């Protein structure tokens, strides 16, 4: 929320001016740091935000067999959500097929060039945009029917967990039976 954004700005200014960062909203310094903790911890060791990704996926697809394992990380940017996503499908789908399916999906912009800067970032591409940006589309080396994707969006316009599910939904609807 706005209190967290204000704390990030304040801590950034304090640290750049050689002062110690004061923590009020976060349990530890957020400026120039990464926190593997969003929302409260549950008994199973996951946070509520991580379990919401699981619950929402099962709910949207209506399939209790879908498995999601997420680690949600707070990264100190003022706006934007970013996700590294691994998808395992029941049938093989090539990265080119996935790229074309996603390119045809409403609200998805593909930015996937294999060069420095050929991928989307939350701050530069997604801020102020309604579209979800997808890049770094590639075969997952650990799964024979797996894909890895990099996804960014403006969290003030679209929620991150929902968009991950929407992308997976597009792949399933258009390719996987």
What annotation goes with each model-predicted range?
Residues 1-101:
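Active-site-lining helix/loop region of Rossmann-like oxidoreductase modules
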Residues 65-177:
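C-terminal active-site/capping subdomain that shapes the small-molecule cofactor and substrate pocket
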């Amino acid at each position: 929320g706005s209190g967290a954004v204000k704390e990030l700005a304040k801590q950034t200014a304090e640290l750049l001016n050689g002062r110690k960062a004061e923590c009020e909203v976060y349990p530890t310094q957020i400026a120039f740091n990464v926190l593997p903790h969003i929302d409260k911890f549950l008994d199973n060791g996951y946070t509520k935000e991580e379990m919401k990704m699981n619950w929402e996926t099962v709910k949207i697809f209506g399939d209790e067999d879908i498995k999601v394992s997420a680690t949600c990380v707070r990264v100190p940017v003022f706006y934007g959500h970013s996700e590294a996503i691994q998808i395992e499908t029941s049938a093989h789908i090539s990265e080119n097929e996935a790229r074309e399916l996603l390119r045809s999906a409403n609200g998805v912009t593909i930015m996937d060039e294999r060069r420095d800067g050929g991928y989307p970032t939350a701050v530069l591409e997604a801020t102020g945009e309604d579209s979800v940006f997808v890049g770094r589309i590639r075969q997952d080396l650990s799964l024979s029917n797996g894909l890895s994707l990099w996804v960014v969006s403006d969290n003030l316009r679209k929620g991150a967990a929902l968009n991950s599910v929407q992308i997976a939904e597009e792949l399933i609807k258009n390719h996987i039976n």
